[in-house]
A protein has these predicted regions:
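Glycan-recognition and catalytic cores of secretory/periplasmic carbohydrate-active enzymes
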Residues: 1-156
Length: 156
């Protein structure tokens, strides 16, 4: 079973580390390879957005949330694609960023009370109206916003 969100998060950690290590080409390539592979596997071709789990053999997922999309993989993908674009200049990452950003900001935000819903059905409908629980706290969303701001600021 694949969890695209965790792999995408790991990809941007590795890309960041490549920057800290004088733009280490091996780490950069590793981060980009993981990111490319997980974007291809994780993107829902039918409804858009990033699937929470994928089976490597394309078998049905047995988890009860198999038809859901969670907020945090989208947060991580927004950071990862923006960082990949910054360090490569490759337009494919700008396109991925735009696609993920548009999908996430179309479906996750609560336009009336703020914050993001954490759990959507595959088609983008709200599954659980909670915006905070044991698993969803104020971490991934503000981290994404802060990192995106810093990355964009570094591009100017």
């Amino acid at each position: 079973m694949l969890c695209p969100g965790h792999a995408i998060e790991a990809a941007w950690f590795i890309l960041n580390e490549s920057i800290f290590r004088n733009h280490d080409p091996r780490l950069k390539q590793l981060g980009l390879t993981i990111l490319d592979w997980m974007l291809d596997w994780g993107w829902d071709q039918e409804y858009g957005g990033i699937l929470y789990y994928r089976d490597v053999k394309n078998l049905p997922i047995q988890e009860y949330w198999q038809d859901m999309k969670f907020w945090w993989p989208h947060n991580e993908a927004i950071i990862a694609t923006l960082l990949a674009y910054q360090i490569t200049g490759d337009e494919k990452y700008a396109k991925w960023h735009q696609m993920i950003h548009q999908w996430a900001y179309q479906y996750f935000p609560d336009r009336e009370y703020g914050e993001w819903y954490g759990y959507l059905h595959r088609d983008g409908r709200i599954s659980v109206p909670l915006k905070g629980n044991f698993w969803k706290g104020p971490f991934h969303l503000p981290r994404m916003q802060l990192n995106a701001w810093k990355i964009i600021e570094g591009m100017e």
